[in-house]
A protein has these predicted regions:
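Surface-exposed loop/turn motifs in large extracellular/passenger domains
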Residues: 1-35, 39-63, 68-92, 96-196, ...
Length: 506
């Protein structure tokens, strides 16, 4: 039907004024060369168009448009939209739903929907102002933007197929929300891929995003971007089941895995059972005034948050008010040596806990610039920090540092104008090799230092530096103190107390 390269409407279903129109079944088993349009014919449409079933089983070489345009108050109801064939648009959207009173109950693609256009409008599927209950893709959707939600709403989007953005522009994304667009629930067991952004919300809101069963989100620039002042609700990544080729559920990028831009927010991030968040710069990055208000839980053997030249987890001016827990064999790592970086005016107030056998931070916990950690840092249950806690610049740590349960951390360093006001405690069977304090701040390390470990601990207090709360050794190994600064007294009036069988050398 139609001629090759035809760009006009071949199937045109329309209504005007207060008309009521019902299209019971439109099924294509052949080839349509041109557009398929279901719409109002005039701008003053106030009636109702109903499409019970639209189904493409073969080939449509053109756009499929279903919408109410202009300022019309009319209604378009679509019960079922099924594509098991191929829809190919040479320009513009492959499939386009439009209108504030356009409602789609079910959209299913098991075939191919592709736009070969090169402009911003050349998305695979676009939803503008319309509402959709269920979006299911087990086929392929491709365009400059894969799926574009522009001031529309999708209740549930399930992808077990392939959604691809072909554009390299910084606005191109596999799935994109803009102009107030929302997706309440995304379940990805397939692949969402982009030459730019995997999933992006530039103005809108994601509710819950679940990645499982080998599902992958990949973006060359970022895996997930939450734009300035926008929202990502809860993110769950479960690596329990991988694909046959060994692909592990996760978020991957050549630059940053997850980015929360200025003022943006997320409620919860949970990574478990071997899931991956990987960026060649940063695994997770929070920018100025970004907020993570819920828990960040990284758990299970093989689970990894991995950075490269940046950090595994980078908080550069953001606020993490929920707890950060790495446990049960999970790893946070970066080739730069920065496992967790808190910088700029960044704040962490919900606590950092590294817990359990085979749980590791491969690199330092760095608190720098004007950043603050106002909560406890706990290394427990056999966990390892293969690096140190480094507080520098004008950084402040007011929570305690606790190493317990057979855990270990290489070192604690306080330098620059840094201040540590919480206590430092190393329990029996745990290990801290050294504490170095060269800070020129008035308080330096103002809390107490207590070593209950049977492993040797070396403490260096530099010229002009201060340890204000006294030093106590209850362990059976040597405690070596090099002091060129000042050491204050503990609650009992003692500067250095040795209750263990090891020697104290000053």
């Amino acid at each position: 039907m139609g001629s090759i390269n035809n760009t006009d409407r071949i199937i045109y279903v329309h209504a005007s004024n207060s008309d009521t129109l019902t299209l019971t079944n439109l099924t294509n088993n052949g080839t349509i060369n041109g557009k398929v349009s279901v719409e109002n014919s005039k701008g003053n449409f106030t009636g109702t168009i109903t499409v019970n079933t639209f189904e493409n089983k073969n080939q449509i070489n053109g756009n499929v448009y279903m919408g109410i345009w202009s300022s019309s108050q009319g209604t378009l109801n679509i019960d079922k939209f099924n594509n098991s064939g191929t829809i190919t648009a040479s320009n513009g959207q492959g499939v386009f739903f439009e209108g504030k009173n356009t409602n789609i109950q079910s959209f299913s693609n098991t075939g191919v929907i592709v736009s070969n256009g090169s402009t911003w409008s050349a998305s695979g599927v676009q939803i503008s102002n319309a509402s959709m209950d269920n979006f299911s893709n087990s086929g392929t959707i491709s365009g400059i933007v894969g799926v574009y939600v522009n001031n529309g709403n999708i209740k549930t989007l399930e992808n077990s197929g392939f959604i691809k953005a072909t554009g390299k522009e910084d606005w191109s994304a596999g799935i994109k929300l803009e102009s107030g667009g929302t997706i309440e629930n995304i379940i990805n067991t397939g692949t969402i891929q982009s030459n730019s952004l995997g999933i992006a919300v530039t103005y809108g809101k994601f509710g819950t995003l679940t990645i499982k069963d080998g599902g992958v989100i990949y973006g060359k620039r970022t895996g997930i971007t939450v734009g300035q002042w926008q929202t990502l609700g809860d993110l769950y990544i479960d690596g329990t089941s991988s694909k046959k080729d060994g692909t592990v559920s996760g978020i991957y990028s050549d630059i940053d895995g997850i980015v929360l831009e200025t003022g943006s927010s997320s409620q919860k991030i949970e990574l478990k059972n071997g899931g991956i968040i990987q960026g060649k710069d940063n695994g997770i990055r929070l920018d100025n005034a970004a907020s993570l208000s819920g828990e960040m839980i990284l758990s299970g053997k093989g689970s990894r948050v991995e950075g490269g030249s940046g950090a595994g987890i980078s908080n550069d001016g953001g606020k993490i008010t929920g707890s950060m827990t790495i446990k049960d064999g999970a790893t946070v790592t970066s080739s730069s040596g920065q496992a967790i970086s808190n910088s700029g005016s960044g704040s962490i107030t919900g606590g950092i806990t590294v817990s359990g056998e085979n749980t590791k931070l491969e690199g330092n916990i760095i608190n720098t610039g004007d950043a603050s950690i106002g909560s406890d840092i706990k290394i427990e249950g056999g966990a390892k920090v293969e690096g140190g806690l480094v507080n520098q610049g004008n950084g402040s740590i007011s929570g305690s540092v606790q190493v317990s349960g057979g855990s270990s951390i290489d070192s604690i360093t306080n330098e620059g104008n840094g201040a540590i006001s919480g206590s430092i405690t190393v329990d029996k069977d745990s290990k801290l090799d050294s504490i170095t304090n060269t800070s020129t701040s008035d308080t330096g390390i103002s809390g107490s230092i207590t070593n209950n470990s049977d492993n040797k601990l070396e403490i260096s207090n530099g010229e002009g530096a201060t340890i204000g709360g006294g030093i106590t050794n209850n362990g059976n190994a040597d405690l070596v103190i090099s002091n060129q600064g000042s050491v204050g007294k503990d609650d009992h009036g003692n500067t250095v107390t040795n209750n263990g069988s090891g020697s104290v050398g000053i």
